[in-house]
Amino acid sequence: MNRNLKCVLSVARSEYIKWITNPRVIIVGVLLVFMRTLAIEPLLERSAKMGMPLNILEPFVAIGNSGMLVMLMPCVFMVLISDYPKMTGNTLFFIQRTGRFNWFAGQIIFLFMSIISFLCVVLTGSVLLSKGEFSTTWSDVVTKYSARFPDEANSFTSSLLPSNLYNQIPLITAILQTLALMCAYLFLLSMIIYFFKLIHIQSFGLFAAISIVAAGVVTCSLKMNIMWSFPMANTIVWLHYEEIIGKPIVPIWYSYIYFCIAVIILVLLNIIAVKRFQFTNIEQVE
């Protein structure tokens, strides 16, 4: 195996082991409790009321499209990676052995590993905490509940899986788009935290990332046009579509381009920061 690749994978493996063994991972359990309370239980109550089975995949789509949970998930993930990249007494030695850019490439792989692991836990947790049948199509609990109980059409539970979603795209497409866009959202926030850590302003990086999440929450809640300038609106799939009309409000490809451009810019900024990284300042951030 190429030496550079070995160095990159070594960095990624080392960081990932530190990450999954960090006591902070217990906060994921708190997120699962919120998921069950805010999304899974309300959908199961509808299933019981209709006497029909819920699709066990639907709660994940609800979680990934709920304004409350799309706010909580990035916040939980930011808590988990807020200390990264690790700047300890061994960092100088580690970077000198691997090389700056091998070290950074390893950090990128680590981030993808941690994001995928995090989303897999959310997806698996939503399936295990739910009950019903497995199918690749939307269940009648989702598509017909509002017609049978019109007085509940504007309830919080209805907003979890609105008609903008199930009338416009298949369930599997909704799951894949939710996973892809949430992955991009978490990576973007991670790159912001990394950049400010690399220029030795760690606290501002976390503040900047939280501010972006907060701005997304506010603009999405008020349905302001400027919401498309923030990653949160671009992450919530149903916001892209009308309720009935097939024409999208904002094409989904816009959000993929948005994230691609934003991520490329942030990765380039991080590469510049790595190139200018001062080893003598490591002890100051330790």
What do the PLM-derived regions correspond to, one by one?
Residues 1-30:
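Aromatic- and glycine-rich beta-strand/loop motifs that create alpha-glucan
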Residues 17-20, 101-102, 195-203, 277:
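Membrane-interface helix-boundary motifs at transmembrane edges
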Residues 32-40, 211-222, 237-240:
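Aromatic-anchored segments of alpha-helical transmembrane domains
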Residues 78, 89, 192, 269-270:
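Hydrophobic/aromatic residues in alpha-helical transmembrane segments
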Residues 79-96:
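Transmembrane helix boundary and interhelical loop/hinge segments in multi-pass membrane proteins
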Residues 195-199, 262-286:
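Junction motif at the cytosolic side of a transmembrane helix
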